[in-house]
């Protein structure tokens, strides 16, 4: 099974013009070229599952285009998506922010999906995608260290409830890489598919390991790569894995 995890930064593109006329102004405009480039890259990888972080699901910024559905249609998948903020968050009332989402794209072999929410942080959404043999969770953790640790504790309790092998993936915002999630991995038994600790951010010259695919002991990682793709400020993660028959590592 092939999983792609990609923080696409709302398909706003990259480069020096992103910060013109003022720093960060690029967040207010999307790039059709970037969106088509992201879709073309994903289609070329022929994934079974795609976890997208920072997706615009139809605000004025994206020209009212639901980026999750656009990419899903281009690869023949279906999409599930939800606003990344808490259900009662004030951000749910702000036109552009309420369309800032995370999404799963998947082939039809899905048994169900669930939305969970962290109790701390601004970005609270957890998407759980249940397949026949595995459960995959998509997260975007807080920029604040203490809140990230509280969110990881919440994730620990959540994945303990799963009877199936688990994958936890997404943008962890871990500025110290795997060192920051060492105790979480020890407590859950998960390990990083990125055995070499390759960085994924920033896309142009990666220095930080912010994005992760963490896998259950009952899962075999067959291939892992971080392609040199620069449609976003993050590079994508590509992970091929299989569930070990009988459930023993």
Residue spans of the language-model regions?
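Short, flexible loop segments at the rims of nucleotide/cofactor-binding pockets, characterized by
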Residues: 25-31, 116-117, 142-146
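Active-site metal-binding loops of divalent metal-dependent hydrolases
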Residues: 7-8, 55, 141, 171-172, ...
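Metal-dependent phosphoester-hydrolase catalytic domains
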Residues: 110, 115-117, 130, 147-150, ...
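Soluble or luminal CAZymes and related metallo-dependent hydrolases
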Residues: 29-37, 63, 121, 147-154, ...
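Short aromatic-enriched loop/helix-cap "lid" or pocket-rim segments at secondary-structure transitions
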Residues: 13-19, 64-65, 91-94, 126, ...
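N-terminal, active-site-proximal structural segment of metallo-dependent hydrolase catalytic domains
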Residues: 1-74, 81-89, 245-249
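Beta-strand-turn-beta hairpins that frame and shape the catalytic cleft
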Residues: 1-4, 12, 106-111, 122-138, ...
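Structured beta-strand-rich core segments of catalytic domains in phosphoester-bond hydrolases
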Residues: 54-133, 225-228
């Amino acid at each position: 099974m092939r999983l792609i995890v990609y923080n696409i930064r709302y398909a706003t593109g990259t480069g020096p013009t992103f910060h013109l006329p003022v720093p960060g102004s690029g967040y207010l405009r999307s790039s059709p070229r970037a969106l088509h480039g992201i879709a073309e890259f994903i289609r070329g990888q022929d994934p079974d599952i795609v976890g997208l972080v920072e997706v615009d699901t139809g605000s004025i910024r994206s020209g009212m285009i639901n980026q999750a559905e656009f990419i899903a249609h281009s690869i023949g998948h279906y999409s599930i998506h939800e606003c990344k903020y808490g259900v009662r968050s004030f951000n749910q009332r702000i036109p552009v922010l309420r369309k800032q989402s995370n999404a799963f794209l998947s082939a039809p072999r899905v048994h169900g999906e669930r939305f969970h929410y962290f109790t701390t942080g601004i970005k609270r959404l957890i998407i759980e995608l249940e397949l026949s043999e595995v459960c995959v969770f998509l997260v975007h953790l807080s920029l604040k260290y203490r809140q990230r640790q509280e969110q990881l504790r919440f994730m620990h309790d959540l994945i303990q409830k799963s009877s199936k092998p688990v994958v936890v993936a997404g943008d962890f915002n871990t500025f110290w890489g795997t060192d920051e999630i060492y105790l979480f991995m020890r407590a859950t038994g998960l390990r990083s598919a990125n055995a070499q600790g390759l960085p994924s951010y920033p896309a142009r010259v990666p220095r930080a390991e912010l994005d992760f695919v963490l896998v259950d002991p009952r899962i075999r990682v067959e291939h892992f790569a971080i392609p040199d793709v620069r449609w976003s400020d993050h590079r994508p993660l590509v992970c091929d894995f299989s569930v070990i028959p009988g459930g023993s590592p």
